[in-house]
């Protein structure tokens, strides 16, 4: 049963929040239409037990769905994806990651990327 409703975001930087926030690691600047690596993981390792684990991670470019990776308690909630940057018609874009803990709900993190 999930005890948290809606989408949660890190506010105070507590260990609890860091265990549930899907941090995005990638370049701050990328070339338009080029592929670049995006790593998504928790800031602090999250328990992966039968009754408490990260269920999935989703990645979006703004509101555009890119990918979803599902996990079981036998996996590390971390993923690396190759993402294609948008065309140069924009100066920047937002990557948005969502992560769901089976007990503590959905957590979100955003990162702004500049286009070269």
UniProtKB/Swiss-Prot annotation:
Fe cation binds at residues 20, 46, 52, 101, 104. InterPro entries: Desulfoferrodoxin_Fe-bd_dom (IPR002742), Desulfoferrodoxin_Fe-bd_dom_sf (IPR036073), Desulfoferrodoxin_SOR (IPR051233). It is an enzyme of class 1 (oxidoreductase). Coiled coil: none annotated. It catalyses: reduced [rubredoxin] + superoxide + 2 H(+) = oxidized [rubredoxin] + H2O2. Keywords: Electron transport, Iron, Metal-binding, Oxidoreductase, Transport. Belongs to the desulfoferrodoxin family. NCBIfam families: neela_ferrous. This is Putative superoxide reductase. It comes from Methanocaldococcus jannaschii (strain ATCC 43067 / DSM 2661 / JAL-1 / JCM 10045 / NBRC 100440).
